[in-house]
């Protein structure tokens, strides 16, 4: 058994395969600025995700931040979003000088509660920014219906949902844009990286300029942009990892099924549900939620500590919820967020990666059983 079991482990191709992939870079000396591998990866990912347009970025955060910027929302406008997400989602709104309006979530799947969105809409609302949390897909139809009714943009944070589908339609086809993260901790990684999927060809041109300092031509800088270009080493890693993605997903599924088999029947613990036949899952996370009413409000933290004593590292995703982050707590509109806070207080994400040994899953689940029962 490994000495240390981390919550995740980066997927990597065979070493020699990656070396051969990057060897031509020593000949071309073209290391960034939309090189050959960058262009090739955009084509391959468009095909894999089944989306009409795709723009690669240096990371998922910049993909989201620049997409919001590209929409051209007036300063001070409001974007309705979830507080149960990684802090990057909220930062991207605020860094664009916009106002996050937090909407509570559903405890069934931890995604934004679409039935509570409409009551939060004001004359300042310009967009909805839902998150496919842990790969659980939002109610895209109802969210789009609301957006159409009020003429709002929909930007999905799909960082947890790369490669997922709804009835054979790639997740990147919903809303006005979908953001993906290719961070080293994700199911699919380019070491660091991200992308935006969308339909509007004009948005591609806008994002192309924005990720290159706003430069439109050698002598024209048309807008204030950023340096958000993916480099060739990351693109090469992405091309290599794409070959092994299905193998990676299959191994993750096997381990999730083993977790569920070992933990099913424990009434103090809510397990994730991957049984929706309309969804093609990619199994990025294994979150469990402790029933505070049955096992106490501190059980999640206690289990976390017990695992850590055995050199097993789980994560409290997402605690605190972004609405309670110290950097902007109490700065924005107060909305009841009981479900989001309950989830933040009681969810623990367990280790999951293709090479995770089943003997380690046995140890993890035994610790959980002994602790809660």
Model-predicted regions and their roles:
Residues 1-31, 351:
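N-terminal "arm"/small-domain region of PLP-dependent enzymes with the aminotransferase-like
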Residues 36-44, 48-52, 115, 127-131, ...:
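PLP-dependent aminotransferase class I/II
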Residues 85, 108-109, 135, 186, ...:
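Glycine-/small-residue-rich active-site loops that bind phosphorylated ligands and cofactors
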Residues 173-209, 232-235:
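Active-site PLP attachment segment
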Residues 156-190, 217-222:
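Conserved active-site segment immediately N-terminal to the catalytic lysine
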Residues 30, 34-78, 92-95, 102-104, ...:
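Phosphate-binding glycine-rich loop
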Residues 55, 80, 101, 154-155, ...:
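Structural detector of well-ordered beta-strand residues that form the stable sheet scaffold
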Residues 69-149, 153-158, 165:
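PLP-dependent aminotransferase-like
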